[in-house]
Amino acid sequence: MEVNILAFIATALFILVPTAFLLIIYVKTVSKND
């Protein structure tokens, strides 16, 4: 089970990090348009 938990955490970080980065760029772009 420990391996599955670690894999879940690694996958979550792998997805959340780029997503958060894209969201920050998107928010900055929208703010500039306003």
Swiss-Prot record:
GO biological process, one term: photosynthesis, light reaction
Keyword annotations of the record: Chloroplast, Membrane, Photosynthesis, Photosystem II, Plastid, Reaction center, Thylakoid, Transmembrane, Transmembrane helix
Membrane topology summary: Single-pass membrane protein
Assembly mode: PSII is composed of 1 copy each of membrane proteins PsbA, PsbB, PsbC, PsbD, PsbE, PsbF, PsbH, PsbI, PsbJ, PsbK, PsbL, PsbM, PsbT, PsbX, PsbY, PsbZ, Psb30/Ycf12, at least 3 peripheral proteins of the oxygen-evolving complex and a large number of cofactors. It forms dimeric complexes.
Family designation: Belongs to the PsbM family.
PANTHER family in UniProt: PHOTOSYSTEM II REACTION CENTER PROTEIN M
Protein known as: Photosystem II reaction center protein M
Organism: Ceratophyllum demersum (Rigid hornwort)
Gene name of this polypeptide: psbM
